[in-house]
Amino acid sequence: MDGITVITGPRSGAGHLFALLRNFESIAPFDDLFQPGGQSAGVRIDVAELEAHRQGKSLLALKLTSAVPRDIAEEQIVGRMGMRTMFVVRRQIDAYVSLAKATALGAWRDTDMTPVKVKLDAERFAKWLDEQEAWYVHWKDWLERRAY
């Protein structure tokens, strides 16, 4: 089955994208398929494909974050036959502030963070920003190398 891997970072809006994808009859969105523990990524995708086929779906949509080790992501997810990729990137400062608010509240979904005020640490932001940029650069470079 063909698929799309959504490469994303924390608080990017990918959760909203997956909520929208649930409106398409032919798409089987799995935004939490790669939670820690259990089966390998490849086995999880195989099981998701079977489930999608039973539901009459023709396209898998998977969310890939830095929580998945890169070697596993390369071999079992992004490098899989028929898999395409797309990036979901939010303005980094907005993603970081949203992450800080969600962490402070312990609320990750369906919570209005507008009134929440947090103090930000510039050094922590710089470190987080470096990590996020390295994550996206890795996948951009990997995909460019693979295209030739």
Locate predicted features.
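PAPS-dependent sulfotransferase catalytic core
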Residues: M1-S58
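Short coil/turn segments at beta-strand junctions that form active-site/ligand-binding loops
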Residues: D2, G56-S58, M81-R84, R146-Y148
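Proteins with a high burden of low-complexity, intrinsically disordered sequence enriched in S/T/G/P/A and R
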Residues: Q39-S40, E144-Y148
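Conserved two-lobed SF2 helicase motor
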Residues: K57-S66
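PAPS-dependent sulfotransferase catalytic domain
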Residues: S66, D71-R146
